[in-house]
């Protein structure tokens, strides 16, 4: 396979061409954060056991991923500044520390049954094998032979033999981002290490990739949300791009119509230049793998998303190194333009007006990285979401266990949807909604709740200077309309002011404002504000007007 990672002229251009300065700035900023005056973090037994005892993965993950950031930074610096022997020395130290890790799996991904299994295959163990294989290929002429021997032995034991000796692995049945990340990483690692062994497992790798595509809607959308599109599609594209170099031009995996549609998904779900749709376990902040968008621009001529969102993820060497190799300074990104996006199969509708952006979803409550959120909607001004979807909560054992929906972000209580007869929405595919797009946008929500409901329909009228959201219902003895926002509401002249937008509602409804402190995905405290509306008299309709 052509060793594209070692193209000396390309790396010379990165160093000397002033158009690459933003990338070099990002590299040295990460160096200052993760490497300068920092030792390789020691991962202790108590770090390993923290998740088992408390369900908190923060302490272990911080050290684990800092090591991978150091790995990426030093390896890339070695290519740009080959005369600096200190970078190579530091890199080899990090490589050996990673090779010494008891397992390449994070503690949260090791089951309680086989916690002593050192060669388990899950997201980050598969990634680690790939990172080391690519660094070995990239610096084969500079790494100490003992380091090369160690990398080869650990990859063989932890990735290649582990995969060859296991059949019908649980990860081979998944249809989420895991399929692309695990399958792509394993496949590329085999490519780098052994042609003969790769072709023996190629059919299994193709199963991973086909499973990943099966989890994508026919119109190219993913219910996992923007962040997991960015993750899974990154490894899908990376695998087939690497495969095309391996077999000299075979790009079949990238020529499928669904893949072409997928390529445009990310750019299509922006609400403004900084914010995206944050349904499911997403952040709502437009941050994308820089290399991926430049690759997709070259391959599919996609609409480039706002350049400020371009991100080099130094936790993932293979994505980080490609940012430097695939970056094209001539690719420019325009501001997000007004327009509509309708993913019928996914049941998402997004519309961008001059003054605001809007998104609403239906689907079902058994999706990947599911939230119970049928009928949930987002409204953003030109700066931020003012009626928000909170997106992903902090990842803990609870978040992926039987009590997932006790977490505010994940339950319907944490979304802008009604509470009906004192109940939140149900969990599972049996609880669903129907999105209808015509003159108005509407969601039939009556099947999203445990109790039988005659009628519960949310309709939205979008105008240039604002929108109206109307819920109509019958066969309900108690209803509480709920809105979620991160903005502290200001009540003025009977209106609710959220960052300049004016919300008005029917006078025969009573407003109760409260707040709640939740944990963000990063583990920080965040105060969110809950706007609850209760009818003063019997009614079968609630209308909310939002003016900009």
Predicted regions and their residues:
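Extreme N-terminal leader/anchor segments
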Residues: 1-27, 65, 76-80
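Solvent-exposed loop and edge beta-strand segments that line ligand/cofactor-binding
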Residues: 55-68, 107-125, 164-180, 217-233, ...
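Well-ordered alpha-helical scaffold segments within catalytic/enzyme domains
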Residues: 69-82, 86, 127-144, 182-196, ...
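CBM-like, beta-strand-rich accessory domains located in the C-terminal region of large
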Residues: 308-311, 398-548
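Catalytic core of carbohydrate-active enzymes
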Residues: 356-434
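Long, well-ordered core segments of solenoidal/helical folds
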Residues: 31-44, 90-109, 147-169, 200-220, ...
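Active-site lining segments of carbohydrate-active enzymes
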Residues: 112-227, 238, 325-337
